[in-house]
Amino acid sequence: MEKWARIKYTPNLPLGENGERVTASQKHIELSCEAACEGMVLLKNDRNVLPIRKGTRVALFGKGVFDYVKGGGGSGDVTVPYIRNLYEGLSQYTSDISIYDKSVRFYQEYVADQYRLGIAPGMIKEPALPEDILADAAAYADTAIIAISRFSGEGWDRKVAGVDREIKCEAKDLVEQGNKIFDHGDFYLTNAEKKMVKMVKENFSSVIVVMNVGGVVDTTWFKKDDQISSVLMAWQGGIEGGLAAARILLGKVNPSGKLSDTFAARLEDYPSTEGFHEDDDYVDYTEDIYVGYRYFETIPGAKEKVNYPFGYGLSYTTFLLEDYKAEPFVASAADEVGKSDSDLADAIVASVTVTNIGKIPGKEVVQLYYSAPQGKLGKPAKVLGGYAKTRLLQPGESQRVTIALYMEDMASYDDLGKVKKAAWLLEKGEYHFFLGTSVRDTRLLDYTYELSKNIIVEQVSNKLVPTSLPKRMLADGTYEELPQTEPVDTYATIFPRPKNWKETIEHDVLKTPVVRPQDRFQLFLPPKEGDPKKFIEVAECKVTLEDFIAQLSNEQLASLLGGQPNVGMANTFGYGNLPEVGVPNAQTCDGPAGVRIAPEVGVVTTAFPCSTLLACTWNEDICYEVGVAGGEEAKECNFGAWLTPAVNIHRSPLCGRNFEYYSEDPFLAGKQAAAMVRGIQSNNIIATPKHFALNNKESNRKGSDSRASERAIREIYLKAFEIIVKEQSPGASCLQYNIVNGQRSSESHDLLTGILRDEWGFEGVVVSDWWGFGEHYKEVLAGNDIKMGCGYTEQLLEAIDKKALKRKDLEKRQSESSRCFSNSTKLKAA
């Protein structure tokens, strides 16, 4: 009853020990800092300049020293009690180092002035560095630290040089500000930043760079420069990102992060760059399954374009990997139930001994890759199949690391019928396995898995088939033409549209229902004879869900299929809100970096590191702990659902929302996010993986068509969601705005019912993204349970009158959401 009572009274009561709040508590803030330390990646450390030795005098340069970006904008933003920048982090250790003060004051005053003008963090122009300050700093110190920061956010994509046309987006002020600052696009240094870096290099023998960014940026300027000694990819580290970076720079923490993306030499080296801003109305995913390292490790000539490979990251200590082993593993008979083919071995178990042969404690990440035969389908040269992070190993200490890979997880999808149409299959031939510490630093294991025939792992049916994608890339770098079909008119509707309907945001038309304050007190009134059945009786198994729904009128059912008004501290609306039958208005909250509450409410929460950083921890335990902590804050602030994690793929560095997402690799993204879901739901808070699916571009996000092959969709863009659904049974799934192969995702029966529910067994509630362009009645038919931020009750009732909908369609959608809410106290826990 605790959950229900909290919904009834909407309190903000402390849940911590001794009556203390958990929201933005010191414990959670320390966890945020710990997670940030775990995911920051040391890219370069020539001459072992890092860690900075005790007694060193340092000078700080770059507006990023104070212009610290804790995370991206939009749903990923968080209202926090404070933010600790790099200078403030280093200032905690003045007993270890001395900091030159004049450059500090210069940047502090400059950044403060820019903030007062209303310029967003990360969007401030680099100021000209006064020569007298530089000369004085060089006389004071021989070690310089340069900080570079970047910002991006929801509703707009990163700037790229050479695109002069106006791009449709929802944050024109930020785009215009970026146009003023970034001479070559924000992937590269600005001219002002280049000048500052050049001046610093000319005056200091040791130069350290700290990158405070949310996504992939140019690394060529420091990789090939011997004058830059060390580089820390600090990402966007949340509330304590500056302190976390300081701890690593000073050796208080040994870095153990590994890249979750490939860092190429140039933006143009990513195949997705070409065509990203070609048109606002569509994006062709012509690189197909060759995304990230799958491209750079496979396509001829692409390897040489990589500066830092996927999985790469340095440490202050040295690890020795030895005694590599690999062997087949056959599960027990109980585990074999449901296997699709008796000829399919269950798994390979790979293991290696990791020893810290250095002088300080540290952690290492062991990564297992596999290589499948090219066959008729074509495959990437390597694919991540498993990983494990060691515990903190003391000097001389060893740990045996074991990783299992199920053979069926190596299956490829045949969309065109080259082997067996619409089937997940393993092609005959040899499968090889590699174990190491990055996609490049691996050893071929002495075990080969050989198939003498093709094995069908799962037979499904074609879904989300493209109609307008002209071609796709093959493993040799050439392209094959794809069949073109006549697109279906998915914009057809039984209702008249305004002439400018594509430009009309629905919440300008739809009216959010008003909550009567006194209705809240009807939720838990004792039932009287003749009263309607109450929802709490369903949760208590006194009334069947079918009987409860059967008593509802069409109007009541239609109302429940739309989002409900904000109450309490919410700003992203609620689910439910039918008090006459005891259905509460359970509130939702953003977002991927922490519980987002509007500043005017006066409640601050913990800002955790951006999801890209969390992916770079390669540590499911830390993601689980962040999920637990965030779930506790959501619960204490009386939210029923947390709209996280966001698990779209880093297809292109240009996506403005990559900071919310984990990786270019769906397996890594899925496993890390699944751990977070497990943590969230241990609090009986509904986790909501989003944005389902192919949300890889923010420009014109409500009207852009993502055109991809069915194989790429299934193997790359849906795989992380599939892992989460099958491993952690999330209570909800949030859709995306865009169109997929000509059909709006919220209206796609293939996506919502065919794949999500029928193939994967999803049993939660599906919600649209807020204020999308989908027709509500078509969303109901497709399998969308709740239209957010509010529904269109009148349209649903009219659709029933026009025979476009049946009452049973509404009942089906309501049964999905009611089952989710009534079972919310039984969600998977730790």
Curated annotation (Swiss-Prot):
Matches recorded under Gene3D superfamilies: Glycoside hydrolase family 3 C-terminal domain, Glycoside hydrolase, family 3, N-terminal domain, Immunoglobulins
SUPFAM superfamilies, per the entry: (Trans)glycosidases, Beta-D-glucan exohydrolase, C-terminal domain
According to its UniProt record, the EC number is 3.2.1.21
| Gene name for this UniProt entry | bglA
* PANTHER family attached to this UniProt entry: BETA-GLUCOSIDASE
Q: Which Pfam families match?
A: Fn3-like (PF14310), Glyco_hydro_3 (PF00933), Glyco_hydro_3_C (PF01915)
Protein name, as recorded? Beta-glucosidase A
Q: Which residues catalyse the reaction?
A: D769
- Give the family this protein belongs to, as stated in its UniProt record: Belongs to the glycosyl hydrolase 3 family.
Gene Ontology molecular function terms on file: beta-glucosidase activity
The EC category is hydrolase
Some GO term, biological process aspect, for this entry: which one? cellulose catabolic process
Key words of the record: Carbohydrate metabolism, Cellulose degradation, Glycosidase, Hydrolase, Polysaccharide degradation
Q: Which reaction does it catalyse?
A: Hydrolysis of terminal, non-reducing beta-D-glucosyl residues with release of beta-D-glucose
Asked if the record carries the keyword Magnesium, the reply is: no
Q: What does this protein do?
A: B.fibrisolvens beta-glucosidase hydrolyzes cellobiose to a limited extent, cellotriose to cellobiose and glucose, and cellotetraose and cellopentaose to predominantly glucose.
Which InterPro entries does the record cross-reference, listed alphabetically?
Cellulose_deg_GH3 (IPR050288), Fn3-like (IPR026891), Glyco_hydro_3_AS (IPR019800), Glyco_hydro_3_C (IPR002772), Glyco_hydro_3_C_sf (IPR036881), Glyco_hydro_3_N (IPR001764), Glyco_hydro_3_N_sf (IPR036962), Glycoside_hydrolase_SF (IPR017853)
